[in-house]
Amino acid sequence: MALSKTAQPMQSSLRKIAVVVATAVSGMSAYAHAAETPKKEETITVTAAPAPQESAWGPAATIAARQSATGTKTDTSIEKVPQSISVVTAEEMALHQPRSVKEALSYTPGVAVGTRGASNTYDYLIIRGFAADGQSQNNYLDGMKMQGNFYNDAVIDPYMIERAEVMRGPTSVLYGKSSPGGLLNMVSKRPLTEPLKEVQFKVGTDSLFQTGFDFSDALDDDGVYSYRLTGLARSNNAQQERAEEQRYTIAPSFSWRPSDKTNFTFLSYFQNEPETGYYGWLPKEGTVDPLPNGDRLPTDFNEGAKNNTYSRNQKMVGYSFDHEFNDTFTVRQNLRFAENKTSQNSVYGYGVCSDAANSGNALCNALSPADKGHYLARKYVVDDEKLQNFTVDTQLQSKFATGDVDHILLTGVDYMRMRNDINAWFGYDASVPLLDLYNPVYSDFDFDSKNPANSGPYQLLNKQQQTGLYVQDQAQWNKVLVTLGGRYDWAEQDSFNRVTGTTASRDDNQFTWRGGVNYLFDNGVTPYFSYSESFEPSSQSDAQGKPFAPSKGKQYEVGVKYVPGDRPIVLTGALYQLTKTNNLMADPAGSFFSVEGGEIRARGVEIEAKAALSASVNVVGSYTYTDVEYTTDTNYKGNTPAQVPEHMASLWGDYTFYDGALSGLTLGTGGRFSSSSYGDPANSFKVGSYAVMDALVR
């Protein structure tokens, strides 16, 4: 059994102290007042104030969130969404102490988070057996896509968000172009009208040093104006030697609430990462399989050059606005402008010299057959990118009734524009020395000679646009809830090659829809059935230079949810079949180009439990079964896609003491299991199963 190399933090939180003191003062004040004027036969009636209504865009009181907007774009109870939704609250993240959002999803069903090992450079996810097309993430912040391109993807620190939500299955009916497996949506921390004062310090293994703060309060007596200021600074070594992670983040926000019907919130996010950590490729020789001499590589092995660097800078500004005209009509608008810059100088592994992919490497061909099995071929990349992204989503929500049927009708239009300026050079030549895995010798690489500012074969200006019109009706008659929605998208992409002076363009128009039925029993049990669709444009072209048509996803899902009204418990189970058509595959004629027509089918079962059993006890558990297969493909028909484990399971529990000498102490432990998965689509080798144990003392 392997232990994770996640640091075990020591944390000090001023927020907990403030809560305890405030409670004690409040209690003494009430007691003193009652003692002032004792009366005979006095009857005192105590009425508990109702708990504040949870909002899909705000904090949840426990680890078991009951509301979400990710699945409907409206503030909807989880049991009323006809698809699988998982919510990881800030409370749960505080228990697990993740260093990335993908780590925060480690106990979430249907999501494979460890496809790049311990690397936290990106939050790449495989959901229900599918990853996003190309290198881009399928991640959203406050309901708007953080559109990435090439190596330029934004990453949000988990300390800066209130929720991380995963919607599994096709989502194009609400969000447009998307991976068929699902998406991740993060909800930013927002201003509060009650005082919040938190300062934290962490130290841990891998030379972890972190400090963070989270302040919020109203700026006036009426709570019309409020602010929130959240920040973090962290430095730690990555698991691989000679790799470091540094992050400095601050997120100021401001809210204006002139009435209980109007809310305007300014949101911003600024993050600088001088070093994003390790992002390379380890060979199967020495990791999955032993080297020819029987040895294995150390767990901190790094195949890169001594002077590898990978930095990123992010800036985001925007707002969230909503206004309730009356009991029927509410308008909402979310808007954001983002700018991301990445700079990378990296040497990375490309398999041992005996691999067929390295048959054209002159350095490999100079070796004897016996040596090819322990010499690692390497490539380099020199890359500078500047990406700008603008997104706006405007919605009109209408609540009304037609006879005995209550409706929540949502109509909306959203627009996204992305521009990424790429200057890159990559490949391998005699200047990239081989690495002897028996006795690796590291040196600096002359990246300046490959500087793309001077010249480079990969100088592109990539542009993407998407406009979508959508409508959705949540119609409830007694205990039957029908959700029906449709969307039409206009998607454009252009790639201008500065080297050749040519432009490749592709326009796609696509209609997608979703239908679902839920039956709401009085005891909190809700069975449901749904059908949903997705589409995902391709950036590749055929042998004649014609861009490929989008791939499409179709899913049938049946499940049951248990969300009792009087207890913080969420239990869900789902059974689904998901098919991706028009997947790209190798040309049967043997050319180096791909062709359309491939198909991948996924079937699976997912079970999740989240429960705050008492004020002291939390339990989180999940199980995932995923059966994915290339049903139509030139080379891989019948095979399983890479990096998709058949089984995953997790269980977590924690206990907080509220009395005695241990009052305020929280103890927790958990475990995660993943079965083996194939390392390539040819299914030529497997990466073994593993189990990881987690522990908490706070």
Regions found by a protein language model. Give the residues of each.
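Conserved C-terminal beta-signal and adjacent last beta-strands/turns
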Residues: 6, 17-19, 35, 385, ...
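Outer-membrane beta-barrel translocator/receptor signature
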Residues: 159-162, 173-252, 256-262, 315, ...
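Face-selective signature of the C-terminal outer-membrane beta-barrel domain
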Residues: 317-339, 378-496
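Structural signature of Gram-negative outer-membrane beta-barrels, strongest in the C-terminal barrel
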Residues: 255-259, 387, 406-418, 460-580
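Gram-negative outer-membrane beta-barrel transporters
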Residues: 479, 577, 596-681
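Acidic/polar loop-and-plug regions of large Gram-negative outer-membrane beta-barrel proteins
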Residues: 234-238, 251-257, 261-324, 339-387, ...
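Acidic, small-polar-rich N-terminal luminal/periplasmic segments of exported/outer-membrane proteins
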Residues: 3, 41-195, 199, 534, ...
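Membrane-embedded beta-barrel scaffold of Gram-negative outer-membrane proteins
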Residues: 322-324, 330-336, 340-348, 527, ...
